[in-house]
Amino acid sequence: MAAESLPFSFGTLSSWELEAWYEDLQEVLSSDENGGTYVSPPGNEEEESKIFTTLDPASLAWLTEEEPEPAEVTSTSQSPHSPDSSQSSLAQEEEEEDQGRTRKRKQSGHSPARAGKQRMKEKEQENERKVAQLAEENERLKQEIERLTREVEATRRALIDRMVNLHQA
C-alpha cells in the first residue's frame, strides 16, 4: 500500500503557520467535551490503548463556521418520553451549549485558533523587525571594524617607520 503525498511541501510553510496548525491539532485532539476521547500525556498506557473516536458533525461546526443543519441536531436527540430521558436531556443541553459557543465565536469573529494564528503572525513580524535591526547593527559594527583596522594599520606603519629611523640615527 503506497502512502499518498502531501498537497504541499514542508519547505513552503512558515514557522508561524506550522505552529498554528500544531495548536489547532492539539485543540482538536484534546477536545474531551465535544465527544472525543481525551488524549492523555505519554506514560498512561491504559489511555493510550483507546482508539480516538471521531467527533460528530454538529460538534465540528465551529471548524467550518457553518451552523449545523437542524436534521443533524434533531436526529441525535430522543423524545422526552423515552426511558433514557435524563440522558437525552443532558445530551440536548450539551448540544445547545455547543451551538451557543459556535454562535458566540461567529459573532465575535475570533476563534482560539485564529487568535493563536494572529499571535504567531505578530510574533513573526516582531522577529522580522529584530532581524532587520540586528542586520543594521551588524553592518554598523563591520564599518567600525574596518575603520579600526585602518587605524591600526596606520599606527603600525608609523611605529615601524619610527623604529627604522631610530636604528638609522
Curated annotation (Swiss-Prot):
GO biological process: anterior/posterior axis specification; artery development; ATF6-mediated unfolded protein response; blood vessel maturation; calcium ion import; cell redox homeostasis; diaphragm contraction; DNA damage response
Outcome recorded upon mutating A115V: In a colorectal cancer sample; somatic mutation
PROSITE patterns reported in the protein's UniProt record: BZIP
Low complexity bias: start-end ranges: 74-89
Phosphoserine found at: S14, S15, S30, S31, S79, S82
Annotated segments matching region Leucine-zipper: 134-148
Interaction with TRIB3: annotated segments: 10-18
GO cellular component: CHOP-ATF3 complex; CHOP-ATF4 complex; CHOP-C/EBP complex; chromatin; cytoplasm; cytosol; late endosome; nucleus
PTM annotation, UniProt: Ubiquitinated, leading to its degradation by the proteasome.
Domain bZIP: start-end pairs: 99-162
Region feature (N-terminal): 10-26
Induction: Up-regulated by oxidative stress, amino-acid deprivation, hypoxia and endoplasmic reticulum stress. During ER stress, induced by a EIF2AK3/ATF4 pathway and/or ERN1/ATF6 pathway. Expression is suppressed by TLR-TRIF signaling pathway during prolonged ER stress.
Subcellular location field: Cytoplasm; Nucleus
Basic and acidic residues bias (residue ranges): 119-139
Keywords of this entry: Activator, Apoptosis, Cell cycle, Chromosomal rearrangement, Cytoplasm, DNA-binding, Growth arrest, Nucleus, Phosphoprotein, Proto-oncogene, Repressor, Stress response, Transcription, Transcription regulation, Ubl conjugation, Unfolded protein response, Wnt signaling pathway
Domain of life: Eukaryota
Basic motif, as annotated region: 101-130
Molecular function terms, GO-annotated: cAMP response element binding protein binding; DNA binding; DNA-binding transcription activator activity, RNA polymerase II-specific; DNA-binding transcription factor activity; DNA-binding transcription factor activity, RNA polymerase II-specific; identical protein binding; leucine zipper domain binding; protein heterodimerization activity
Location of region: Disordered: 32-139
InterPro entries documented for this protein: bZIP, DNA_damage_induc_transcript_3
Record text on subunit structure and interactions: Heterodimer. Interacts with TCF7L2/TCF4, EP300/P300, HDAC1, HDAC5 and HDAC6. Interacts with TRIB3 which blocks its association with EP300/P300. Interacts with FOXO3, CEBPB and ATF4.
Sequence similarity: Belongs to the bZIP family.
Function: Multifunctional transcription factor in endoplasmic reticulum (ER) stress response. Plays an essential role in the response to a wide variety of cell stresses and induces cell cycle arrest and apoptosis in response to ER stress. Plays a dual role both as an inhibitor of CCAAT/enhancer-binding protein (C/EBP) function and as an activator of other genes. Acts as a dominant-negative regulator of C/EBP-induced transcription: dimerizes with members of the C/EBP family, impairs their association with C/EBP binding sites in the promoter regions, and inhibits the expression of C/EBP regulated genes.
Connected disease: Myxoid liposarcoma: A soft tissue tumor that tends to occur in the limbs (especially the thigh) of patients ranging in age from 35 to 55 years. It is defined by the presence of a hypocellular spindle cell proliferation set in a myxoid background, often with mucin pooling. Lipoblasts tend to be small and often monovacuolated and to cluster around vessels or at the periphery of the lesion.
PANTHER family: DNA DAMAGE-INDUCIBLE TRANSCRIPT 3 DDIT3, DNA DAMAGE-INDUCIBLE TRANSCRIPT 3 PROTEIN
Protein name: DNA damage-inducible transcript 3 protein
The gene coding this protein: DDIT3
